[in-house]
Every structure is written in structure tokens, then in C-alpha cells.
């Protein structure tokens, strides 16, 4: 289900402040965030965020195409190791 347009995009309040501090300093440092639910806004373009995946922070460089998506979409939480090997085939 899509969020109502009249509500606007959801962004945690502290995230805007952190992004402004990095922009003002001019340094290109990774902004560590735990808010996977926050929407990527146009003022985040060009910044690098470390999105927490439950284990570590995955660096995500925000581009124009990412605006409107959620941070959590770009930091997978599960690792796929493939399906289990067929033990009968190995014995032969």
C-alpha cells in the first residue's frame, strides 16, 4: 500500500540534521544511519550513507535515480548461499 500524498515522505528528523552538517563541512564522509524506513530526498543526492543491515553498515552513495525509494532497499539483510547440494549426487 502506498503512503498518502498529503502526508509527504517519511524521514527521521535526525537524518536531515546530519545531512546538513556534512554538506556544510564540505567533507565527503559516510553518515551512519539505522533508519532503513526513511525515504531518500533530493537533498541527499551526492552524499554517502552507511545503512545498517542488522550486522554492519553498508555504504550507499545516493544518486538521482534513488530519490523516492527507502534506504533499506539498498542494504540487503539476508545472505543467500544457494540451495543445498544434492548429497546423493556427491556420493557417486
Curated annotation (Swiss-Prot):
Family statement drawn from the similarity comment of this UniProt entry: Belongs to the universal ribosomal protein uS19 family.
Identification of the protein by name: Small ribosomal subunit protein uS19
Pfam assignment, any one: Ribosomal_S19
UniProt GO molecular function: rRNA binding; structural constituent of ribosome
Function according to Swiss-Prot or TrEMBL: Protein S19 forms a complex with S13 that binds strongly to the 16S ribosomal RNA.
Stored PROSITE patterns: RIBOSOMAL_S19
Keyword Thylakoid on entry: no
Domain of life of the source: Bacteria
SUPFAM superfamilies: Ribosomal protein S19 (SSF54570)
Record organism: Bartonella henselae (strain ATCC 49882 / DSM 28221 / CCUG 30454 / Houston 1)
Gene Ontology biological process terms from the UniProt entry: ribosomal small subunit assembly; translation
GO cellular component, one term: small ribosomal subunit
Keywords per UniProt: Ribonucleoprotein, Ribosomal protein, RNA-binding, rRNA-binding
InterPro entries linked: Ribosomal_uS19, Ribosomal_uS19_bac-type, Ribosomal_uS19_CS, Ribosomal_uS19_SF
